[in-house]
Structures are given as structure tokens and as C-alpha cells.
């Protein structure tokens, strides 16, 4: 982002360093089917997902503002129209996942639906999380939801699970998809990493952050999806699985064991940091 290149705002750049990504954030990535009616339409490093229904599309995550042209191109390459997107969702309120929301909303007229705990951040374009990184364009929020609320379009229903920690309103979405006559439970997992410089003990921005993460891992252990994806491709092995998908054979995104390992590894990292901060 240009904002991080300006010497005059070095302090802001330092604050957002852990939220910045590598060059892959702004590199194209071929769109592909994840499972059933669910497609990957993001960049190499920032995930965006398109869920196709008879009544139009649902997009989860808009990446940075610079991601929007890539998302649009990928949607069209799949044979769909961006103007058919009716609902815009998000995993959480950080600039690399909602930075393109305002532009996508203008381009599509889509209804923006957000978790209540991230509503103010998304609407004002201000990072209210423990990270406190760069902001984004203000977004008109059309509907505010709470934990376990559902969003339905064209017979497809997604359930919103509040999984706080990374942000206060971090949302893991679940739905079902059918492929080759089989039904798969799918989870779009919100980020569970702890950004560099964020403390779990004595955090003045988000005092309950340690308890938030603990709640999240309890919930994630119980989800048990067949297919899991996340807000950065590296988290769920996007590139390797995409190569296997192109080669044919069994759908590589059907990976319940990979999900279990992901949750265990992420929780271990959280507990390691928590114990270190507690001096244990």
C-alpha cells in the first residue's frame, strides 16, 4: 500500500508491519473451484471466495483495495458477472480483508453484512483490534449479525460463528456444498494468528483478548468440517492443493485431517505465547 511507503508516516508503517503481506498479496492467482458452488477468486496471498447461487453470488472477503481488479477478473474468468454479486461478507475487520469492500459495494450494489463486534470498525474504516494497523475506506453496513445468525441467498445458507481474538468480531462462516452427489460441510475460518507485537496479557486495547482466543479454539475444535479454507492461502495449502486439483483425482480441498492439525497447531502457538507472557 502506498501509505506504507511514505516517510512521514513511518510510525503507522511500523504499527502495521505485521499486517502487511509479501508480494503475493498483489499477484494474480488463477480462479478455481474449491468444492461444489464455492470458488476461489482472490490473489495469490489474499483469499476471496465466491459462492454461486440461483439468486446471485456471495463474496467472502475483499482483500485490500488493490485486490478488487483481481477479484473482478477472476469472477469473470469463471464465467460469472461481478454485477450478480448480491451479498458481501467478511472474516474480520483488517485492511487486508475488507480493504476492497467499499469498491466492491459500489461496483455491485451488494448488501454488506457484518458481525456486530466488527461493525463499527468496518463502517468507519478504522482498525479497532489489538493490532491497530492501517485503515480503509468507510463502508455502508446494511445488516448487522450476531453469533450463530444465518445469511441465506438462493437456497444457500451460511452460519456466522463468532471466533474473536484476531479481531473482536472475527467471523468463521460455515455452509454445506454438494459435489458428485456428496454433501460436504465447509468452513471459511477466520484468522487465528496473533499479530506481532500484540500481547495476550495486559492488553489495553482489548483486555479480554486471551479469553477471546480461548473461546475461539473451543469452538473451532467442535466444527469438524470436511473442507476448510482461510483468509490467507498459505494457511490451508492453496497453491499445493490447486496443483493437485488441476491434475485431477480426488478433491484435495476435502481435508478434515488438515483442519484438525491446523487448529491444534494454532492453539499450541496461542498457549505458548500466553504461558510465556504469564511467566510460566
Regions found by a protein language model. Give the residues of each.
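Accessory terminal helices/loops
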Residues: 18-24, 180, 194-280
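Active-site HxH/HxHxD metal-binding segment of metal-dependent hydrolases
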Residues: 66-69, 76-150, 254, 262
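Active-site environment of divalent metal-dependent phosphoester hydrolases
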Residues: 67-68, 93-99, 119-122, 168-171, ...
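Metallo-beta-lactamase
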Residues: 20, 27-29, 33-35, 84, ...
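Active-site neighborhood of phospho(di)ester-bond hydrolases with catalytic His/Asp-centered motifs
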Residues: 60-62, 85-93, 112-115, 162-165, ...
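Bacterial N-terminal signal peptides
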Residues: 5-15
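Conserved beta-strand hairpin/beta-sheet module of binuclear metal-dependent hydrolase folds
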Residues: 24-78, 82, 173-194, 199
Amino acid at each position: 500500500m502506498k501509505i506504507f511507503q511514505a516517510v512521514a508516516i513511518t510510525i503507522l508503517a511500523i504499527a502495521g508491519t505485521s499486517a502487511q503481506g509479501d508480494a503475493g498479496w498483489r499477484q494474480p492467482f488463477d480462479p478455481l473451484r474449491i468444492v461444489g458452488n464455492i470458488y476461489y477468486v482472490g490473489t495469490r496471498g489474499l483469499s476471496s471466495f465466491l459462492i454461486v447461487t440461483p439468486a446471485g453470488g456471495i463474496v467472502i472477503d475483499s482483500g485490500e483495495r488493490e485486490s478488487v481488479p483481481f477479484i473482478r477478473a477472476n469472477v469473470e474468468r469463471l464465467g460469472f458477472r461481478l454485477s450478480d454479486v448480491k451479498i458481501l461478507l467478511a472474516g474480520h475487520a483488517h485492511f487486508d480483508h475488507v480493504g476492497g469492500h467499499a469498491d466492491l459495494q459500489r461496483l455491485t450494489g451488494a448488501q454488506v453484512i457484518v458481525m456486530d463486534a466488527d461493525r463499527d470498525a468496518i463502517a468507519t474504516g478504522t482498525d479497532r483490534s489489538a493490532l491497530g494497523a492501517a485503515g480503509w475506506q468507510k463502508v455502508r453496513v446494511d445488516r448487522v449479525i450476531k453469533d450463530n445468525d444465518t445469511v441465506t441467498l438462493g437456497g444457500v445458507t451460511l452460519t456466522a460463528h463468532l471466533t474473536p481474538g484476531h479481531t473482536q468480531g472475527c467471523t468463521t462462516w460455515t455452509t454445506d456444498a454438494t459435489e458428485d452427489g456428496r454433501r460436504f460441510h465447509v468452513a471459511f475460518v477466520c484468522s487465528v494468528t496473533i499479530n506481532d507485537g500484540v500481547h495476550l496479557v495486559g492488553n489495553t486495547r482489548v483486555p479480554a483478548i486471551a479469553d477471546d482466543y480461548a473461546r475461539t479454539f473451543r469452538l473451532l475444535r467442535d466444527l469438524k468440517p470436511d473442507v476448510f479454507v482461510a483468509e490467507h492461502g498459505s494457511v490451508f495449502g492453496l497453491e499445493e492443493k490447486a496443483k493437485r486439483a488441476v491434475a485431477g483425482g480426488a478433491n484435495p480441498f476435502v481435508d478434515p485431517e488438515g483442519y484438525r492439525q491446523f487448529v491444534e497447531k494454532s492453539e499450541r502457538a496461542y498457549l505458548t505465547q500466553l504461558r510465556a507472557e504469564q511467566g510460566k
